[in-house]
UniProtKB/Swiss-Prot annotation:
One of its GO terms (biological process) is phenylpropanoid metabolic process. Residues 271-340 are annotated as: SBD1. It comes from the Eukaryota. Both substrate-binding domains (SBD1 and SBD2) are involved in the substrate recognition, and are sufficient to confer the substrate specificity. ATP binds at residues 198-202, 206, 340-341, 345, 429, 444, 535. Gene3D superfamilies: 3.30.300.30, N-terminal domain of ligase-like. This is 4-coumarate--CoA ligase. It catalyses: (E)-4-coumarate + ATP + CoA = (E)-4-coumaroyl-CoA + AMP + diphosphate; (E)-4-coumarate + ATP + H(+) = (E)-4-coumaroyl-AMP + diphosphate; (E)-4-coumaroyl-AMP + CoA = (E)-4-coumaroyl-CoA + AMP + H(+). Residues 341-408 are annotated as: SBD2. The lineage of its organism: Eukaryota, Viridiplantae, Streptophyta, Embryophyta, Tracheophyta. It comes from Vanilla planifolia (Vanilla).
Length: 553
């Protein structure tokens, strides 16, 4: 009998929860209503600040313009459940378009404006976008497709030629609409509001259906409650330099900032000097970054010329941040708490958040990427058996809660592979939870290098490589090897004005790791390919290895 009980106990999931208590979340509210629920407290305060022009929109302005855009979209035939594509860099118009679509129950699919025409059109087709909002310089990418398929194009600025202008509407067509004529719609909490595209744990990009309830839950998990996990308030200024077409910026910067009544300083793209100037000029208090930005700050020689003392929070996400890089950037922001979050588009996206960011903060460890968010459950499972694992045992990270995606658009098979029958979303990331409930990411399940059966985590080697002063960036991927199966190889970007050889790099790593983690080859490159989120595009590097032998110098 005792043996049977023991076996039954083993079958039970070991579930981890936040140190913070669960809170009430108004899941019945549409996303826009939730974001503007407390607007009466800060309607006249700055909401959006355009870093390029210094133009300021108050909360009252943003809410009104978004309603007008919703009305304008409706006049152009966009109905509840229809999808619009936002093909824009960071800009106030991006925000107005997204919120305007939400007001009328429509869906926004966000695309990287630097995509090729083929990539943009593929997403437009897959999402069945009825209208594309873009800039004049990107119109040529979609013009022919739009004409052939009856898709309307709206440009936020002038178009490139008179011929284009005749067929393309200006954004003022939306902002000039009467907000009182916006249709009244009943929006279901399970209605889709955002459709970002993600490759998930494997395969081609797929539309991730994020609902009103899901995004409301995710934002609330971060910024709501008496002791918010991510403390923001109406005196804060958030620097929105990460692209809004990526869910990290859309959720944890824009939507969280709106809910908290903070000022959101919009920067179109990251350049170190304008970035530092804006922080100093607007006294930025919260900096949501990704590792490439953190790396640029840590390595920059001009940072010390600027007053960054206003920054109280530096949050990094989208990819793991090593302890050495954490320590380096701490020195640049004397008054800031530095910590990490962990997310995945399909998870809504935030799974874990650093508790040093809480209103009543907790002590944290370097290298940890937070504790599971409140109102959610996390477990770690053995990738081979699916059995849940106890603390300090690495396995695949799984999350369950109302914040996760509804599923992949028109792809029930991929949805079923990602979300199991019990509602657990399988991330494809390998990590463990320690004795203090902190989550540590080891690596991506599919990125682990197998050396004679030993697992080698690329992120670990990359963090070591970045500690060398002659290396400005690095990525590690597997290379096929007859004897070992796979061996680690490094792609390295040399720091300006520095020189280093392949042998020097190999020796530098060999002194710090066990034999099977040693770097086998080093390839020097001009840049490491990365997604807008900051994640290394390892498949591109693996493809280069497969295509041809690369010179080492």
């Amino acid at each position: 009998m005792a043996a049977a009980v023991a076996i039954e106990e083993q079958k039970k999931d070991i579930i981890f929860r936040s140190k913070l208590p669960d809170i009430y979340i108004p899941k019945n509210l549409p996303l826009h209503s939730y974001c503007f629920e407390n607007i009466s407290k800060f309607s006249s305060r700055p909401c959006l600040i355009n870093g390029a022009t210094d133009e300021i929109f108050t909360y009252a302005d943003v809410e009104l313009i978004s309603r007008r855009v919703g009305s304008g979209l409706s006049k152009l035939g966009i109905k509840q459940g229809d999808t619009i594509m936002i093909l824009l860099p960071n800009s106030p118009e991006f925000v107005f378009a997204f919120l305007g679509a939400s007001f009328i129950g429509s869906i926004s699919t966000m695309a990287n404006p630097f995509f090729t025409s083929t990539e943009v059109i593929k997403q437009a087709k897959a999402s069945n976008a009825k209208l594309i909002i873009t800039q004049g310089c990107y119109v040529d990418k979609v013009k022919d497709y739009a004409c052939e398929n009856g898709v309307k194009i709206i440009s936020i600025d002038t178009t490139t030629t008179a011929d284009d202008a005749a067929n393309i509407l200006h954004f003022s067509e939306l902002t000039g609409a009467d907000e009182n004529e916006m249709p009244k719609v009943e929006i279901s909490p399970d209605g889709v509001v955002a459709l970002p595209y993600s490759s998930g744990t494997t395969g081609l990009p797929k539309g991730v259906m994020l609902t009103h309830k899901g995004l409301v839950t995710s934002v609330a998990q971060q910024v709501d409650g008496e002791n918010p996990n991510l403390y923001m308030h109406s005196d804060d200024v958030l620097l929105c330099v990460l692209p809004l077409f990526h869910i990290y910026s859309l959720n944890s910067v824009l939507l969280c900032g709106l809910r908290a009544g903070s000022g959101i300083l919009i920067m179109q793209k990251f350049e170190i000097v304008p970035f530092l100037e804006l922080i100093q000029k607007y006294k930025v208090t919260i900096g949501p970054f990704v590792p490439p930005i953190v790396l640029a700050i840590a390595k920059s020689t001009v940072v010390d010329n600027y007053d960054l003392s206003s920054v109280r929070t530096v949050m990094s996400g989208a990819a793991p941040l090593g302890k050495e890089l954490e320590d380096a950037v701490r020195a640049k922001f004397p008054n800031a708490k530095l910590g990490q979050g962990y997310g995945m588009t399909e998870a809504g996206p935030v799974l874990a958040m650093c508790l040093a960011f809480a209103k009543e903060p907790f002590d944290i460890k370097s290298g940890a990427c937070g504790t599971v968010v409140r109102n959610a459950e996390m477990k770690i499972v053995d990738p081979e058996t699916g059995s849940s694992l106890p603390r300090n045992h690495p396995g695949e990270i799984c999350i369950r809660g109302d914040q996760i995606m509804k599923g992949y658009l028109n792809d029930p098979e991929a949805t079923a592979r990602t979300i199991d029958k019990e509602g657990w979303l399988h991330t494809g990331d390998i990590g463990y939870i320690d004795d203090d409930d902190e989550l540590f990411i080891v690596d991506r399940l599919k990125e682990l290098i197998k050396y004679k059966g030993f697992q080698v985590a690329p992120a670990e080697l990359e963090a070591l490589l970045l500690t060398h002063p002659c290396i400005s960036d690095a990525a590690v991927v597997p290379m096929k090897d007859e004897a070992a199966g796979e061996v680690p190889v490094a792609f390295v970007v040399k720091s300006n004005g520095h020189n280093i050889t392949e042998d020097e790099i190999k020796q530098f790593i060999s002194k710090q790791v066990i034999f099977y983690k040693r770097i086998n080859r080093v390839f020097f490159v001009e840049a490491i390919p990365k997604a807008p989120s900051g994640k290394i595009l390892r498949k591109d590097l693996r493809a280069r290895l497969a295509a041809a032998a690369l010179p080492t110098n």
